Amino acid sequence: MDLTINEKRVLAALIGSGPKAAEILAEKMDAALESVIQWAHLCADKGLVTLEKTVTEQAKLTEEGEKYAKEGLPERQILNSIDGSIPMSELTKNPLSKIAIGWLRKKNWVTIKDGIVFVNENTAVGEDELALKNPVPGTPACKELAKRGLVEVVEKTSWKIALTTDGEKIAKDGLDLREEVATLTREQILSGEWKSLPLRKYSIDKLPKKIYGGRVHPNQQILDEIRDLLFEMGFTEFHGSIVQNSFWNFDSLYQPQDHPAREMQDTFHLAEELPLPNGWEKIRDIHKFGGDTGSTGWGGEWSPEVGKKCVLRTHSTSLSIQYLAEHPNPPLKAFSISRVYRRETIDPTHLPEFEQLEGIVMDKDLHFGHLLGFFKEFFGRMGFEEVRFRPGYFPYTEPSVEPEVWVDGLGWVELGGAGIFRKEVTAPWGIDCPVLAWGLGVSRVSMLRMGLKDLRQLYKSDIDWIRASPVRRS
């Protein structure tokens, strides 16, 4: 039987004796207790020793408990300072009184009457005071001290180790206790010394221990792949705040304040407000009567106070329109991959927060065909060979479309919405050319790419799944 040098040392230390405490064995071997226990377990796995485990409770004083063991409990110290009686106003000047007064009354050591504290006759030393000198686990006094944070009860595990019949036989047959050599030097090889050295044996039939390095989360890998793809296609990335006022999240995108279109997404509303940007009056006029766009608008009233109210962004289109307002001149190609928030019921296909890819392209002479062509190119590079389009509706685009991709086993899967921004959206910011816009649920793209059936798995803290996921290279 192949044994390591430390396993042999354990067997040798047990020769000629019965069960031996691990502490005694460690002292005899001049080794750390934890190491000896580990080596003994290895011997036990090979049937050479037995281990008997015993768990006992030990009580030890905390730092505060040690202090009171020397000075006395707070109630005893206060009691000793009272000469028969004392006004409560004087007693409370002692810092210990905050702790002691309650215990003095609980132990019936004092009586308080008309603001005077009187010492009672029976103030004998209590069980808790005796236990403070020698706490015994499980006793009422020890439990009381533990509640006061003066005693800590800990479990101590001890081991007894003994040779089995097989272990005793191997030990008596003789053990080579020379240190095994794991690495040979050049001199040992050239001189032939290696032939007489006790070489450490290796099991070549055992798989090595897996080493897990740092890993990028599988979902993040796909987000990075999408980001790199759009960079290759000439896009610029933009960012924005999670918290948006209703003006940018709804009003600037031609969603009326008193219309069901505003309820298309259930929203997380916040108590805070943010100011409206310069030029907000143009949005007001467009909502009320169409402004100078030729539209009739929504009619009715429009409140700037409603526009100031904050929400967690329900879509990243709010970032797109802000970016366009800051960059109104064509040509422009930009995108954002952002977390958005909606009051969804959690199920395998819906979460209250998820990543959305938002993109915009602005240039003269752009038309709807360019938008469809972009999707075919983009999804093709993402590995979806078949793409089709269905008519859609969004308050801020016209015409609107919903792209779908074919997934084996699932059929056609809708991945987002797109269209050309309406004049009511772009005109207030001085934009007079077409703007192609889209928003895609990239969390769903990740889910399809990885073959998942439950969207929640993308965000679970499952380290084994992350380790087992293939590394994706863009």
From Swiss-Prot:
Cofactor comment: Binds 2 magnesium ions per tetramer.
Higher taxonomy: Archaea, Methanobacteriati, Methanobacteriota, Stenosarchaea group, Methanomicrobia
GO MF assignments: ATP binding; magnesium ion binding; phenylalanine-tRNA ligase activity; tRNA binding
Source organism superkingdom: Archaea
Gene: pheS
Entry's localization field: Cytoplasm
Gene Ontology BP, a term: phenylalanyl-tRNA aminoacylation
Reactions mediated catalytically: tRNA(Phe) + L-phenylalanine + ATP = L-phenylalanyl-tRNA(Phe) + AMP + diphosphate + H(+)
Pfam family of the protein (one): tRNA-synt_2d
Name of the protein: Phenylalanine--tRNA ligase alpha subunit
Organism of provenance: Methanocorpusculum labreanum (strain ATCC 43576 / DSM 4855 / Z)
Keyword terms, alphabetized: Aminoacyl-tRNA synthetase, ATP-binding, Cytoplasm, Ligase, Magnesium, Metal-binding, Nucleotide-binding, Protein biosynthesis
